[in-house]
Design a protein with these regions (language model features):
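Thiamine diphosphate
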Residues: 106, 114-122, 263, 269, ...
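N-terminal alpha/beta PP-like core and its mobile active-site loop of ThDP/TPP-dependent enzymes
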Residues: 2-340, 386, 441, 462, ...
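Active-site diphosphate/adenylate-binding microenvironment
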Residues: 15-29, 34-38, 42-44, 351-439
Length: 553
């Protein structure tokens, strides 16, 4: 469907006018950005019905937009400062791409009149800089092409697999006369699976004696918990979360949920031993991290794979793949298997955590007298509000966190798909803003390591300025514990730069306008955490924990 924004134009209409009308028509009235000289002509005369969310550094800007887009299930608009700003944002652009978040990323470009001379702040080869972490990158040839370029960017970002796109926009384009009204289009955002291949998958599952389901983040992105549960119950089959899943695809208190698969070949294969058919839905096959030798699959297991991302189906090393929407595929398989009588459920060892690289520690004190991560997270679970949203970036403590806090409601857990630190804190700010904008107003809690906290710390200034009453729990072990675990696995002793003593989290947080405190005992921690929701600004709680180096797998 296409509609003209208006049928006639009066003299004086500019590229800026038409572009803002296009953005308005798509509901893209919130812009996450960090202002630079090459963007000022776009932002001049900023419309009253638009909102500019300022971040102090572009990595924070990118991840705030990512969190906001995920939590609203809508694309978000990012405005960066030429090549320098895009460079600052690249780590979180990589994460947004792997999160499959629809972002329209724009950056200003020097004036066309001088581009050949490469003056200061020229983004040389602008469309190459963000690759390969965007679906499409473009610099319009004419100023009058800018609105149409935005329309293509929106369509490309939102079609599956969703992801970021990039536009480089010369600063002198915005005041140019517009060639005509912008055209607003809609595009489908789901791809139905091939019916014949889906029937073939159903027949394989129907004849399985011990099937197993492996669910991934695409189910959560597609709001598909209901469909995921329906298929699992129809098959009476155990459900694993795919390795390192960035969203929770299934209720972790469901009797059929058995935990998160490890993210190494050998251990993952061992977990699937004894099954004859595995169905992977909405995840790659598989997301690995450390190399631990072993087969991709145990002997006798046939793997079926469903993803809306042809890159995932293409690179899968084993199995038969089908390209299609995860949630539509789940519903279709449930219908096809409606008359199926599943085999009796077999006992499966249930793990007390999900997507964790190693077993959880015991929830008791540590030899050095400090609290353990398990104790802190158990206390947090006791005082967290109902329906709280957890945003996590403390990789070495992940199993302890999920032991204490199983994810039992949809859209209440977020983390990164990339493994690159610096996403959680600003993403939590974007999610908290989305919670307020949507009217859900669920409390947002970020759990983050003291090392991770440093990467995009500027984002807490934005949270304070927006008066978002979120809770940020910083567990302080004065080290990069996950890297020590990796070094231990790789038999690489003596690696420098893994200890980070002397960080004053409280002073940093207060300097950015947050309420902050250092708490060293559980009673004080629980009291301060409960009080966070009475504040008008974010609360940052620094809590020392024992420095422990758990095994990686």
């Amino acid at each position: 469907m296409t509609t003209d924004i208006e049928q006639t134009r009066t003299d004086g209409t500019t590229v800026r006018d038409v572009t803002y009308e296009l953005l308005r028509a798509h509901g893209l009235t919130t812009i996450f950005g960090n202002v630079g000289s090459t963007e000022e002509t776009f932002l001049a005369g900023f419309p009253a019905d638009f909102r500019y969310v300022l971040g102090l550094q572009e990595a924070s800007v990118m991840a705030m937009a990512d969190g906001y887009a995920q939590a609203t299930r809508r694309p978000a608009l990012v405005n960066l400062h030429t090549g320098a700003g895009l460079g600052n944002a690249m780590g979180n652009l990589l994460t947004a791409f792997q999160n499959k978040t629809p972002l329209i990323v724009t950056a200003g470009q020097q004036t066309r009149e001088m581009l050949l001379l490469e003056p200061w702040l020229t983004n040389v080869d602008a469309t190459m800089l963000p690759r390969p972490w965007v679906k499409w990158a473009y610099e319009p040839v004419r100023a009058q092409d800018v609105p149409a370029a935005f329309m293509r960017a929106i369509a490309t970002a939102t079609q599956p697999p969703a992801g970021p796109v990039f536009l480089s926009l010369p600063l002198d384009d915005w005041g140019q006369p517009c060639a005509g009204p912008a055209v607003v289009r809609t595009v489908a955002t789901r791809v139905a699976p091939d019916p014949e291949q889906l029937r073939e998958f159903a027949e394989v599952i129907r004849h399985a004696s011990d099937p197993v389901l492996i669910y991934g983040a695409a189910i959560a992105r597609g709001n598909g918990w209901q469909q995921a549960v329906a298929l699992a119950e129809a098959l009476n089959a155990p459900v694993w979360a795919a390795p390192s899943s960035e969203r929770a695809p299934f209720p972790e208190d469901h009797p059929l949920y058995v935990g998160g698969l490890p993210f190494a070949m050998g251990p993952l294969s061992d977990k699937l031993a004894g099954h004859d058919v595995a169905l992977v839905v909405g995840a790659p096959v598989f997301r690995y991290y450390p190399y631990v030798a072993g087969p991709y699959l145990p002997s006798g297991l046939r793997l079926l794979h469903i993803s809306d991302d042809p890159a995932e189906t293409g690179r899968a090393p084993v199995g038969d793949s089908l390209v299609g929407d995860a949630v539509l595929s789940l519903a279709g398989l449930t219908d096809l298997l409606a008359s199926h009588t599943p085999p009796p459920a077999k006992p499966h060892a249930r793990l007390p955590h999900r997507m964790a690289p190693h077993p959880a520690m015991a929830a008791n004190g540590s030899p050095d007298g400090l609290l353990s991560a398990a104790q802190v997270f158990a206390a947090l679970n006791q005082v967290r509000p109902d329906h709280a949203v957890l945003v996590e970036e403390s990789p070495s403590n992940l199993p302890d966190l999920h032991t204490a806090w199983p994810v039992t409601e949809p859209d209440t857990f977020y983390t990164f798909a990339s493994g690159g630190l610096g996403w959680d804190l600003p993403a939590a700010v974007g999610i908290a803003l989305a919670e307020r904008d949507s009217g859900r107003n669920r409390p947002v809690i970020a759990v983050i390591g003291d090392g991770s906290f440093q990467y995009s710390v500027q984002s807490i200034w934005t949270a304070a300025r927006l008066r978002l009453p979120m809770l940020i729990v910083v567990v302080q072990n004065d080290e990069y514990a996950i890297l020590k675990s990796f070094a231990m696995l790789e038999q690489a002793p003596g690696v420098p730069g893994l200890d980070i003593p002397g960080l004053d989290i409280v002073s940093i947080a207060r300097g950015y306008g947050c309420d902050a405190a250092r708490v060293a005992d559980l009673d004080a921690f629980k009291q301060a955490a409960a009080a966070a929701w009475t504040k008008e600004v974010p609360t940052v709680l620094e809590i020392p924990i024992s420095a422990q180096v758990p095994p990686l797998v």
